[in-house]
Amino acid sequence: MTDFQAALLSSQLKKLPKFQKRRKEITARYNEAFADVPQLFLQKEIPTADTTRHLYMIRLNPERISCSRAEFFNAMSAENVQCQVHYVPVYWFPYYQAMGYEKGECPRAEEIYSGIMSIPLYPMMSDEDVSDTIHAVKKLCAYYAKK
């Protein structure tokens, strides 16, 4: 680590408690807003764990929603909410494919991957941005709800 990187890290670490507090506030709003949305599976909160809340993942419930993750993702983008997809099953990467690993080896991991995405969660998010994200998620869950 260079001196410059260390100086940047030092100044950022001083902000960490404030950042964590804000992430907890946003996470609490999301948890409350989505608790009764059957089209979603939410991350389980562990009361004794204190996390940095790096991501807020949602998983589409395939039994309750009529769209793919790609459709939901694109619809969120159309609502001006940028989502991300993370955690590709590691054995899908070329290195592991070259070692003989193939898609289908871990069907549960692939099923979960096919429905997960993260919604915005960052310390500088305004309350209005949080509300807009909640509104977009709930609107699309209602729109794509299986009848």
Where are these regions (language model features)?
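PLP-dependent aminotransferase class I/II
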Residues: 1-147
